[in-house]
Each structure stands twice: as structure tokens, then as C-alpha cells.
């Protein structure tokens, strides 16, 4: 009888990536298979997020539910990972002593050993250290699940925005070696992946070491990934404006694989609030970067993050944010009411904006951006869009579903042989959350760029044997 694993994940795409790696790791090392039902599991893992308000209380509420399962199944192993685990450490076990394992984002690769030690009766295991990039050296080979895949290229953030917990929960910026990143993507491409999403808390700050002692910038990485045959779309998240440099903008001029969509968080349209947030850029600098980007890629759409009701935010500050939104014409946003995060500098500031004022500001901001999004959608009516076909439509299994470059969902009729590839579709209807289209052509009629076969990249990796530093030699041609 196989052992069962249940993972509950909250938070960002990095957490989703980490959870998939936990599943692969425990399958490869211990033979655990995933189950959607926690009642069936031998191991329960909660991968947490500390971004939202009352994150800790949400964790203990979930653990309380699992406590009942453990009462009926004493051998059940319960583990807590992610950013709340990194923040709280052994304090989690103080409040929930039935938790067996507490691990941080950088120590998930040690899970097989920690689970084994618990099962051997060696007591609870707590490891929330920051061993830099070690976890990537210990993970199993990547497995593709469809035409899109996420690849983590770096961890942590060194910007220390006053409201943000990431530097304290995931550590400072550490980039994966270039050849490791390219090798993972080449493996995924050989398995049929067509779109890769590069992940990092501050992804465009990537500075990956190369085999010859050099450093690969994010702009250089984008071009190298684009050269891998089969990878015809590149996304990345999340970017920081201060790291969105001219060399990255130049990539948009000559690298069509990088999609015409960018998520670039600004947080506020007020320089005064940005200073209080310790964001090292001004509104003018942000607008300048967007202007130059649109000159390089005129059809690009932009999304962003906004925090409303930051301490001491006045009506004038908020109106400055609304002015920026109107000037940039954002396609979408992740927008939140400010709430203090324990341990951050902003938590020491008086939370002096009335909650009703915060709610009203958020409602107005979201209403404007939703209207902008609908206008952008309507402008796509009658246009031909290249769709990466992901599978049958959830609305109608007889139809297909895919995404445009600017991340719009499109449903259309077409042969199921298109799944996993690209299709050109004429947009015939615009709906609030999706588009409808008419199939025009498959990728056999397209002139997709071919540069470097994945097998060539894999062959350059010398028998998968790392050097003493754990970095294999990759020589880009």
C-alpha cells in the first residue's frame, strides 16, 4: 500500500513551485503519492504565506483541523513550511505541540530526512535556516505537467521595503548558477513545455554565476532561455522597478519569446509614501521605464501591485496613485488594504488611516483598473491572437482553452490535437473574465524560431557530475 502525502499551499507562485518540488522530492525519495484528501494522508504539509493579514492565526486554525485527524491516526506526520514557519520557528510547536516538523523555504530539501527522524521516534524537527541555494542541488529532476512550467531562478530579496517580510522569511537575494537554470529548462522543453515562467521574489535582480567565474545578468538569461528550441514564451515574476534596467528593455526589441505582458509593482503613486515604504524609486522613474518599454514593445500590457491606506497616506497621496493608474492604463492589479506585518519597520508606524477610508479607496482603485482592463479587452476584439492551448475549456469540454501573451483566457472550438501547442485565434467576443475566438491556424503553419535544441544543452552537461562547488560546466555557443 503506497504512502500518501497531502500538501496545502497558500500564497505566491514561488510557494506553488516549492510545493511541487516537495511532492517530487518525497515521491522520488520515499515513494509518497499525492492525495487531495487529508484524511487519506500519512504526511500532511502546510506551505504557508505571511503576506496577508492574520497569517499566523490562519495557520493555527488549519492546524487545529489537522489535530483532529492526528488524534485518530497517531502515526500521522504534520509539517509546517513556508514563510510563517520561517518567521515563527519553534513558536509554532509552542502553540501546536502536535506539529512534528517546522521547515523554512530554504530547507524543504531536508524533508525526507526530517520525516524519517520523526517516524523513527527522534522527536520533532525544526529547521528554518537560510542555507543559500543548497536546496536546488538536492531536488529531483523536473517533471513537466502540461505546456507551461515554473522555474525558480533566485530566492530572497535584499530591498527591505518597510512593509515587507520577505527578506526576513526567505533571506537575501541568492541566484542559481546559470547552467543549472538552463539545464532545468532544457529538460522541461524536452518534455513538451512551451512556456516557462521564471520565478523570484525580485526576479530581475538575477545575477547568476557562470562556469568560468563570470556573472550572467537577467537580460542575458532571457536571451539564453529564448534560444532553447521549444521554449516559445517566457514570463517572469515578480519584478522590482529599480532592477528594471535598460538592458532588459532592449531584450523586448529583439526577443519575441518574452511575452508582451509585464507585472511591475509600484505600490503607490505618491513619492512621499514611496519614501516611507523605502521603495528606492520615484513615480517619475517608474513612468520613464514604462514609457521606454512601450517604445520597445508598443503592444505590451502592464499590471502592478498597490497598497492603499499605508500609514499617513493622505487624500492627496491617494489621488497621486489614481493619477498614475490613469496615466499608465494598467491591465490588472493585485491591490490590498495595508495591514502591519510583525517585525517590519512599518509595523512601528501608527496605522492612522481609518478602515472605512481604506475600503473606499480600495474599491475606487479596483473599479478604475477593472474598467481599464475591460477597455483593453475590447480593443482585442477582431484581432488575431496567438494562444498557447492548455487543454479543454472548463466551460465546455468540447471547446479548447488557452492564454494570450497578455494572459487573457480564450475559449474556442478546434481539434484537440492543438493541446500543448500554439494556435492563432481571431477574437470574436469579449467577456469580463475571458475571451471567445475562432480558430485560424495551428503551429504547423507558423514560422516559430528554432535556435538550440534541448538535447544539445543536455549533452553539454558532463554526465550530470557537479564540480566541487556543485556547479556543472555549461558552455553557451
Curated annotation (Swiss-Prot):
Cited PROSITE patterns: MTTASE_N (PS51449), MTTASE_RADICAL (PS01278), RADICAL_SAM (PS51918), TRAM (PS50926)
Protein keywords: 4Fe-4S, Cytoplasm, Iron, Iron-sulfur, Metal-binding, S-adenosyl-L-methionine, Transferase, tRNA processing
Location within or outside the cell: Cytoplasm
KW tRNA processing (keyword) present: yes
Cofactor(s) this protein cannot do without: [4Fe-4S] cluster
Enzyme class: transferase
Residues given in the record as [4Fe-4S] cluster 2 binding sites: 157, 161, 164
Classification via Gene3D superfamilies: Methylthiotransferase, N-terminal domain (3.40.50.12160), tm_1862 like domain (3.80.30.20)
EC number per UniProt: 2.8.4.3
Catalyzed reactions: N(6)-dimethylallyladenosine(37) in tRNA + (sulfur carrier)-SH + AH2 + 2 S-adenosyl-L-methionine = 2-methylsulfanyl-N(6)-dimethylallyladenosine(37) in tRNA + (sulfur carrier)-H + 5'-deoxyadenosine + L-methionine + A + S-adenosyl-L-homocysteine + 2 H(+)
Binding site for [4Fe-4S] cluster 1: 12, 49, 83
Domain MTTase N-terminal: from-to ranges: 3-120
SMART domains xref list: Elp3 (SM00729)
Domain TRAM: 378-441
Sequence intervals crossing the membrane: none
Residue ranges of every copy of the Radical SAM core domain listed in the record: 143-375
Main location class: cytoplasm
CDD domains: Radical_SAM
Signal peptide, first to last residue: none
Cellular component GO terms, alphabetical: cytosol
HAMAP family associated with the record: tRNA_metthiotr_MiaB
Similarity comment: family membership: Belongs to the methylthiotransferase family. MiaB subfamily.
Function description: Catalyzes the methylthiolation of N6-(dimethylallyl)adenosine (i(6)A), leading to the formation of 2-methylthio-N6-(dimethylallyl)adenosine (ms(2)i(6)A) at position 37 in tRNAs that read codons beginning with uridine.
Protein name (record): tRNA-2-methylthio-N(6)-dimethylallyladenosine synthase
Amino acid at each position: 500500500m503506497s504512502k500518501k502525502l497531502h500538501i496545502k499551499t497558500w500564497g505566491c507562485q514561488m510557494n506553488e513551485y516549492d510545493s511541487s518540488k516537495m511532492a517530487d522530492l518525497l515521491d522520488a525519495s520515499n515513494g509518497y503519492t499525492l492525495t487531495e484528501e487529508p484524511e487519506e494522508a500519512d504526511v500532511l504539509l502546510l506551505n504557508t504565506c505571511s503576506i496577508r493579514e492574520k497569517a499566523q492565526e490562519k495557520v493555527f486554525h488549519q492546524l487545529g483541523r489537522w489535530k483532529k485527524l492526528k488524534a485518530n491516526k497517531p502515526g500521522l506526520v504534520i509539517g509546517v513550511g513556508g514563510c510563517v514557519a520561517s518567521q515563527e520557528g519553534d513558536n509554532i510547536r509552542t502553540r501546536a505541540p502536535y506539529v512534528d516538523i517546522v521547515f523554512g523555504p530554504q530547507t524543504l530539501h531536508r524533508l525526507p530526512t526530517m520525516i524519517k527522524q520523526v517516524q523513527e521516534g527522534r522527536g520533532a524537527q525544526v529547521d528554518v535556516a537560510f542555507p543559500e541555494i543548497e536546496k536546488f542541488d538536492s531536488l529531483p529532476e523536473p517533471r513537466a505537467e502540461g505546456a507551461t512550467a515554473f522555474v525558480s531562478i533566485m530566492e530572497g530579496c535584499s530591498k527591505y521595503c518597510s512593509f515587507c517580510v520577505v527578506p526576513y522569511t526567505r533571506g537575501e537575494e541568492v541566484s542559481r548558477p546559470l547552467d543549472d537554470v538552463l539545464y532545468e529548462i532544457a529538460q522541461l522543453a524536452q518534455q513538451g513545455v512551451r512556456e516557462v515562467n521564471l520565478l523570484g521574489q525580485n526576479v530581475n535582480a538575477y545575477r547568476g554565476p557562470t562556469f568560468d567565474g563570470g556573472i550572467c545578468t537577467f537580460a542575458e538569461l532571457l536571451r539564453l532561455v529564448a534560444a532553447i528550441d521549444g521554449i516559445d514564451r517566457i514570463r517572469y515574476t515578480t519584478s522590482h522597478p529599480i532592477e528594471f534596467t535598460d538592458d532588459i528593455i532592449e531584450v523586448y526589441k529583439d526577443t519575441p519569446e518574452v511575452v508582451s505582458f509585464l507585472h511591475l509593482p509600484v505600490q503607490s503613486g505618491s513619492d512621499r509614501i514611496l519614501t516611507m515604504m523605502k521603495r528606492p524609486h520615484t513615480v517619475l522613474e517608474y513612468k520613464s521605464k514604462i514609457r521606454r518599454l512601450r517604445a520597445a514593445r508598443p503592444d505590451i500590457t502592464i499590471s502592478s501591485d498597490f497598497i492603499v491606506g499605508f500609514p499617513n497616506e493622505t487624500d492627496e497621496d491617494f489621488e497621486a496613485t489614481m493619477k498614475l493608474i490613469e496615466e499608465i492604463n494598467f491591465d490588472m492589479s493585485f491591490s490590498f488594504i495595508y495591514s502591519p506585518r510583525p517585525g517590519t519597520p512599518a509595523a512601528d508606524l501608527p496605522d492612522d488611516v481609518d478602515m472605512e477610508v481604506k475600503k473606499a479607496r480600495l474599491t475606487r482603485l479596483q473599479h478604475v483598473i477593472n474598467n481599464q482592463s475591460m477597455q483593453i479587452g475590447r480593443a482585442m476584439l477582431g484581432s488575431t491572437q496567438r494562444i498557447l492551448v492548455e487543454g479543454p475549456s472548463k466551460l465546455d469540454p468540447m471547446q479548447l482553452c488557452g492564454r494570450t501573451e497578455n494572459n487573457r483566457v480564450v475559449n474556442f472550438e478546434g481539434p484537440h490535437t492543438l493541446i500543448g501547442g500554439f494556435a492563432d485565434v481571431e477574437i470574436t467576443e469579449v467577456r469580463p473574465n475571458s475571451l471567445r475566438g475562432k480558430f485560424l491556424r495551428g503551429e504547423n503553419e507558423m514560422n516559430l524560431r528554432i535556435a538550440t535544441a534541448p538535447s544539445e544543452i543536455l549533452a553539454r552537461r558532463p554526465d550530470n557530475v557537479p564540480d566541487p562547488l556543485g556547479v556543472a560546466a555549461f558552455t553557451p555557443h
